[in-house]
Regions:
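Short N-terminal "domain-start" leader segments
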Residues: 1-47
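Intrinsically disordered, low-complexity, charged/polar segments
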Residues: 44-81
Length: 94
């Protein structure tokens, strides 16, 4: 989404992640978040390499690449958790 401030256009991005449904998506800031003064003001104050964890499903940033790194971190964490759980099941003594 493009935020207009004093003639400046800035793209903001959102990272959506849902562990239960194994879903991770990066997209331009959605209209509902863009129209929130609180959200757009908060994001506009972030440094170029910062992220803002809005809740347990959304993280925002000015830089798409920063969100790509965050998405990879989340995926790796989920994989480690799944592997740990799988190993626990494999090691059940019967």
């Amino acid at each position: 989404s493009v935020i207009k401030r004093k003639g400046v256009h800035k793209m903001f991005y959102q990272l959506f992640y849902d562990k239960e449904n194994a879903e991770i998506k990066i997209a331009p800031l959605s209209k509902s978040f863009k129209n929130s003064t609180f959200t757009s003001d908060k994001i506009s104050k972030l440094a170029e390499d910062e992220v803002w964890n809005y809740n347990s499903f959304y993280t925002f940033a000015k830089n798409r690449n920063v969100l790509k790194l965050k998405a990879h971190e989340i995926k790796e964490k989920w994989l480690a958790e799944a592997e740990s759980r799988l190993n626990a099941v494999k090691n059940i003594k019967i």
